[in-house]
Curated annotation (Swiss-Prot):
Lineage of producing organism: Bacteria, Pseudomonadati, Chlorobiota, Chlorobiia, Chlorobiales
Keyword hit for Protein transport: no
GO cellular component entries: cytoplasm; endopeptidase Clp complex
Pfam family of the protein (one): CLP_protease
MF annotations from Gene Ontology: ATP-dependent peptidase activity; ATPase binding; serine-type endopeptidase activity
Organism of derivation: Chlorobium phaeobacteroides (strain DSM 266 / SMG 266 / 2430)
GO term, biological process aspect, one: protein quality control for misfolded or incompletely synthesized proteins
PANTHER family: ATP-DEPENDENT CLP PROTEASE PROTEOLYTIC SUBUNIT (PTHR10381:SF70)
Protein name: ATP-dependent Clp protease proteolytic subunit
EC number: 3.4.21.92
Family: Belongs to the peptidase S14 family.
Length: 227
């Protein structure tokens, strides 16, 4: 079967492997200590962010990462189906099937999902960035966003390769239709624009319809404004 990816899967795997070697996924994850009447509790930084309904997608997208993101989305919906969920995206892309699993979950749950690009959102990362709730998709000013067509490897007999090529074309068409629906672009325009890597800065992504706003700074609390 074809191994279809929507982005730098090899690069994403290298990033993840490097993180493991450096201990980033384990011992180097920052811990947050909170003190209450019951004593002290320690949270890893990502668990603490989850309490604020913030999900951080900071790696390549594979089945394991997708499973974690989907589980967090469903959990946060069960906690409060009315409050927004925030996904911060800094991803080089990855597996199409994994990314579509995240996408479908984002559309399925009741809360609005706000997406924010921090650093880079490439290929499936850009796809998920654009898939947030309309009006609630944003980027920091110096982030980079990239769209392109899916890639895949095929092997076996000629008939098998033909079947796999047809499947890749179906997936490509599906992704183009979804991206067009979220950006307001024509499907043919999306196909032409994603024929090769198309990199955008935050302003260009705003004009393309991938995001709705650019965050420069957080607004100051009302008390600070008054002083």
């Amino acid at each position: 079967m074809a191994n279809i990816n929507f982005g730098f899967e090899h690069h994403a795997r290298k990033l993840y492997s490097g993180a493991i070697e450096q201990g980033i996924t384990g011992s180097l994850v920052p811990m947050v200590i909170e003190t209450s009447g019951r004593g002290e509790r320690a949270f890893d930084i990502f668990s603490r962010l989850l309490r604020e309904r913030i999900i951080f997608l900071g790696s390549g997208i594979d089945e394991h990462v997708a499973g974690l993101i989907m589980a967090q989305l469903i959990f946060l919906e069960s906690e409060d189906p009315e409050r927004d969920i925030y996904i911060y995206v800094n991803s080089p892309g990855g597996s199409v099937s994994a990314g579509l699993g995240i996408y479908d979950t984002m559309q399925y749950i009741r809360p609005d999902v706000s997406t924010v690009c921090v650093g880079m959102a490439a290929s499936m990362g850009a796809f998920l960035l654009a898939s947030g709730t309309k009006g609630k998709r944003a980027s920091l000013p110096h982030s980079r966003i990239m769209i392109h067509q899916p890639s895949g490897g095929a092997q076996g007999q000629e008939s098998d390769i033909i079947i796999q090529a047809r499947e890749i074309e179906k997936i490509r068409r599906l992704l183009e239709e979804i991206l067009a629906s979220h950006t307001g672009k024509d499907v043919q325009q999306v196909r032409e624009d994603s024929e090769r890597d198309r990199w955008m800065n935050a302003q260009e992504a705003l004009e393309y319809g991938i995001i709705d706003q650019i965050f420069e700074k957080r607004p100051k609390p009302d008390k600070e404004k008054e002083s």
